[in-house]
C-alpha cells in the first residue's frame, strides 16, 4: 500500500487518505462507485477507471460498484441544485449499459450493483439498521450538506439520505466482499468518512478511504464539458475524432494534469513529459491525446480519429473527396439533416438551428470577424441564404469555426 501512496504523491494525484492506510498489507480489496445517471460513462469517469487499474497494478483487488439504487436518488456532492429524478426503467437501462462498458474497460475485476441489496431494503430496516448510527450534528457539518442547507435551493430529505445509503454500500462490501478501502474523487470524502464511521459504529472493523483531486481547468471548472455538452466515452455519443480533438483543444497548462489522471503512463514518463511540454507543447498534447483515445476506443478508434483529422486538416479540407466526406459523417463528426429544414434559410439561422453556434449573436460576430467558414470559404454576408450552390457532390456541406471546430452536414 505504501508503494501506491508514494506513486500517487509523486504524480500529485493524492487528495486525502485515512490515517494508517499506508500500513495495510496484502490482501486488500477496494471499491469505487459509478452512478448510472446517464446511458454512458463520461470522461470524468475515466479517472475512476484508471484509478481502479492502478490499484490492480499495485496488487489491490478492485471492485466497481454501479449505483442501480443510489442512481434513483442522486448524489448531492458538487451540486448546487437537486438533480431531476430518473424513473426506475431509465436507471435500469443506464445500469446495464454502464456495466457493459465497465466490463469492457475492466475485464478482470468484479462489478457489483447496489440495487441487489438496497433495492429490497424496507424503510423500517433503513431507520433501524442505518439511520440509528448517524447523528444529525455530524451530518449537518458535512460540507456538501452545509452548502445546500443554507442556500436558496435547500436540500431535500432524499438527497440528505444519500450518504447513509453510500455508507451502507461500504459496510455491505466490507462484510460480504472483504472491502476495506473506498476510493473516489475529492468531493466524495465526506461520504467516504461517513461510511468509515458507520462500519466502526456497527463493530465490523476498521475501514479506510482514499481520494484523488477533481479534474478541473485553471478556473476551477470541471474538465469534460464542451459547448455541445458532455464528453462521453460511448463512441456513438462522442466519436473517437471528437475525443481526440477535445484534448488537442485544451490549454498547455492542463496537459500535465490530464497525463497524470487519465493515463497509466509510468510516473517517470509523466515527469519527462512535463519537461518536453516546455519545448514542444503540441507534440506532447498530441501524444497524450493519442494514448487516451487508444485506451478508450482501442487501436481502431485511434486510427479512425487520426484519419478523420488528416482529412480535415492535412490540406485544410480542400480537395476533399466524396468518400472522405462520407467517412467523416460515419465517424461521428457529421449530422444528417433534411434538405427542407435548411435549404432557403439564412446561414445565420441555419448554424444556430444545427447547434454549430450557440446564438445568432455569436454567429453574427463570427461572420463579421471572418471566423465562420462554409466549405473552407469565409461566410461574409450574414443575410446570405443556403442554396444548392453550397452543396459538395450535391449532398455535403463542410462547416468550420476557427481552426478546430468542424462539422459535416449531410443533406441526403
From Swiss-Prot:
Q: State the span of motif ('HIGH' region).
A: 36-45
- UniProt cross-references to SMART domains, sorted A to Z: S4
Q: Where is this motif: 'KMSKS' region?
A: 222-226
Instruction: Fetch the PROSITE patterns from UniProt.
Output: S4 (PS50889)
Q: Mainly resides where?
A: cytoplasm
Q: How does it assemble?
A: Homodimer.
Q: What is this protein called?
A: Tyrosine--tRNA ligase
What species is this protein from?
Answer: Chlamydia muridarum (strain MoPn / Nigg)
The taxonomy runs: Bacteria, Pseudomonadati, Chlamydiota, Chlamydiia, Chlamydiales
Gene name linked to the record: tyrS
Amino acid at each position: 500500500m505504501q508503494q501506491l501512496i508514494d506513486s500517487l504523491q509523486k504524480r500529485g494525484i493524492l487528495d486525502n487518505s485515512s490515517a494508517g492506510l499506508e500500513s495495510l498489507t496484502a490482501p486488500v480489496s477496494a471499491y469505487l462507485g459509478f452512478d448510472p445517471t446517464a446511458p454512458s460513462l463520461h470522461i470524468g469517469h475515466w479517472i475512476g477507471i484508471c484509478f481502479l487499474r492502478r490499484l490492480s497494478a499495485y496488487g489491490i483487488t478492485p471492485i466497481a460498484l454501479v449505483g442501480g439504487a443510489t442512481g434513483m436518488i442522486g448524489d448531492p456532492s458538487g451540486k448546487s441544485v437537486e438533480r431531476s429524478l430518473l424513473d426506475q426503467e431509465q436507471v435500469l437501462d443506464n445500469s446495464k449499459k454502464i456495466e457493459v462498458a465497465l466490463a469492457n474497460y475492466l475485464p478482470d475485476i468484479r462489478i457489483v450493483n447496489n440495487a441487489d441489496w438496497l433495492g429490497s431494503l424496507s424503510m423500517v430496516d433503513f431507520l433501524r439498521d442505518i439511520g440509528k448510527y448517524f447523528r444529525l450534528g455530524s451530518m449537518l457539518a458535512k460540507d456538501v450538506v452545509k452548502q445546500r442547507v443554507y442556500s436558496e435551493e435547500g436540500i431535500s430529505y432524499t438527497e440528505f439520505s444519500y450518504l447513509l445509503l453510500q455508507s451502507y454500500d461500504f459496510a455491505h462490501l466490507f462484510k460480504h466482499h472483504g472491502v476495506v478501502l473506498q476510493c473516489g474523487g475529492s468531493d466524495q470524502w465526506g461520504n467516504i468518512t461517513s461510511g468509515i464511521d458507520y462500519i466502526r459504529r456497527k463493530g465490523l472493523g476498521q475501514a479506510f478511504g482514499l481520494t484523488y483531486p477533481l479534474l478541473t481547468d485553471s478556473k476551477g471548472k470541471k474538465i469534460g464539458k464542451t459547448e455541445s455538452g458532455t464528453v462521453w466515452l460511448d463512441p456513438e455519443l462522442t466519436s473517437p475524432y471528437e475525443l481526440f480533438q477535445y484534448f488537442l483543444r485544451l490549454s498547455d497548462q492542463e496537459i500535465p494534469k490530464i497525463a497524470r489522471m487519465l493515463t497509466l503512463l509510468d510516473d517517470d514518463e509523466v515527469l519527462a513529459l512535463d519537461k518536453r511540454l516546455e519545448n514542444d507543447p503540441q507534440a506532447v498534447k498530441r501524444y497524450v491525446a493519442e494514448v487516451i483515445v487508444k485506451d478508450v476506443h482501442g487501436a481502431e478508434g485511434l486510427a479512425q480519429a487520426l484519419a478523420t483529422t488528416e482529412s480535415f486538416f492535412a490540406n485544410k479540407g480542400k480537395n476533399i473527396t466524396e468518400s472522405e466526406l462520407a467517412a467523416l459523417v460515419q465517424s461521428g463528426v457529421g449530422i444528417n439533416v433534411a434538405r427542407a429544414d435548411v435549404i432557403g434559410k439564412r446561414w445565420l439561422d441555419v448554424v444556430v438551428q444545427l447547434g454549430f453556434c450557440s446564438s445568432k449573436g455569436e454567429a453574427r460576430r463570427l461572420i463579421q470577424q471572418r471566423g465562420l467558414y462554409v466549405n473552407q470559404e469565409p461566410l461574409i454576408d450574414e443575410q446570405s441564404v443556403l442554396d444548392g450552390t453550397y452543396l459538395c457532390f450535391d449532398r455535403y456541406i463542410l462547416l468550420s469555426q476557427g481552426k478546430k471546430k468542424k462539422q459535416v452536414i449531410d443533406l441526403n
